[in-house]
C-alpha cells in the first residue's frame, strides 16, 4: 500500500549557473550553437536566445522579420572584434573586466549593439575616473555615446574644479563653442575671477593664429568688472594679444568700468549652515515651539556676516546630515519630535541654488539618524545611522534622482565621520560596544570594495570625530580634544598639526578655499554658558584664527560650502523671525 506523502518541490540552487556554464562550453560545438557572429576575422558561435535576452539590438534582429533573423552566420560591421568577444563572454558568464585601456572601445561597442547593462557599468567606471586631466574628454565622450548622466557629472566636475582643469592639456584642445559655453556658465566656481580671464588667454596663446580673432567676443563672457584693476592694467600694458587688438583693448577697458547686466558679479565660496534644535528650544522641555525661527544661512567670510537663505522646512530637527554637491545643498535623514517621541526618517531634501527653494528628492532606502553624508564623484553617500548593528551605506545619483545600496563597511562603528578624498570614501570611527580604538576604512567606487587601512599614528580615540578633505589630505578633529590630525593617503601616515584654540561640540569641519572652518558650541564657566565660536585653519601657515560665531545657539546643525552670488542675497540673518527670500 502506498503511503500519502507531501509533494516535494525540488530546487537546485546552482541550476541557472550550471546551465550558463554548460552553454559556454557548448558554444564551441557547431551543432549546438544556433548562430555564428562574424566580426572581422573572428567567428563567435553563440545562441540567439541568450543574445536577445541581453541586447534589444539582437532581440530585434532575431525576433523580427529581417534577413539576419534566419541566417546561421551573421556579419557585424563597425565594431571591434575583441570588444564583441568580451560582450559575448559577458552574456554567458556575467563577468567583465573594464580597464582604462578598453573602457572607451567597450562603451562604443556596447552602445552600438545596445547592451544596456554594460553601457551602465562602463559609464559608472568613467564617472569614477573623473579628474582634472580627463573630465573634458569624458564629457564629450559621454555625449557622443548617449551617457548623459556621465556627461552631466563631468560638466559639474569642470564647474567645481575649473582652475585645475584649465591647467591641463585637454583644456587647450577645446573647440571655441565649448570654451564659450564653459566661460558663460553662471555656476563656474572660480576664485578669484581673474582665473577665468587667465584660462581664456592661455587657450588663445596655444594657437594664436586661429584663435586670436575669437578673443574680443570671448572676453565678453568673463566677468571683467570682478577682475582686480591692477591685473587689467597690466594686461593692457604688457599682453601682446591685447595690445594687437583694438577690440580687445576696448572690451577690457569697458568691461572693467561698466557693470555687465544679467551676469553674476560676486560669485563667492561661502559657508552654509542648516540649524536644528537650539539651546532655547531645548530649555523649553523639548516641546514644539509656537513659532519658527530662521534656520538656513550662509556666512560671507570676506564681510564676516551671516545672510539669510530660505528656511529649511523641517524645523527643530536633529540627527540629520548635510552635504553639498555642485553648489546644491542636501539634507538627509534625522529625527524630530519631543524627547520621548522621536523617530528616524528616510527623508531627503535638496536646495537647488538656481531655483532657490527647498524640494524633497527621492527618499533614502534606509531611515537614518546621526549618520554621515558626503559628496564623492558626483554623488551623495549616506553612511551609517540605521538601526542595524552594521554601517549600512547608500548613494544618491542627482541625475536619476535615485538611491542605490553600497556594501557595508567591514568594521562596525557608531562614533564616526566620513569624507571623500582623492576619489575614495574614507570612514574614521570607533564603537564603544565592540572596540574603542579608532579604525580607518576606505571604499573605492571603482572596485566597489571596502578595505581596512592599518595606518601608523592614527589617534586611538576621539569623541564625535569629524573629518574633511582639503588639497588631497584628510583632516580629523574630535569633541574631546583641541588636537588636529592630518592624514596623507599616498604615504598612509597621520601626523599632528597646530591645535585649535577651543573645543567645539556637535559641529562640523568644512573646507573653504584653502582654509578649514570648524563650527560647534562649547560650555564655558560655572554658570554653563554656551558659546558657538568658529575657527579657521590656514594649512599653509599651520595656524588657527577665531572667525566669528554661529548666528544662533544651535545644539545641532549641519554645514558645508557652496558657491553663490552674494549680491543676490542681501537680507541679514535675524534668528528671531522667519526668513523669506
Curated annotation (Swiss-Prot):
Q: Which ranges carry the BACK domain?
A: 135-237
Listed A to Z, the keywords are: Kelch repeat, Repeat
Keyword RNA-binding (UniProt):
no
| CDD domains documented for this protein | BACK_KLHL30
Residue span, BTB domain: 33-100
Pfam families the UniProt entry points to: BACK, BTB, Kelch_1
Q: What is this protein called?
A: Kelch-like protein 30
Provenance organism: Mus musculus (Mouse)
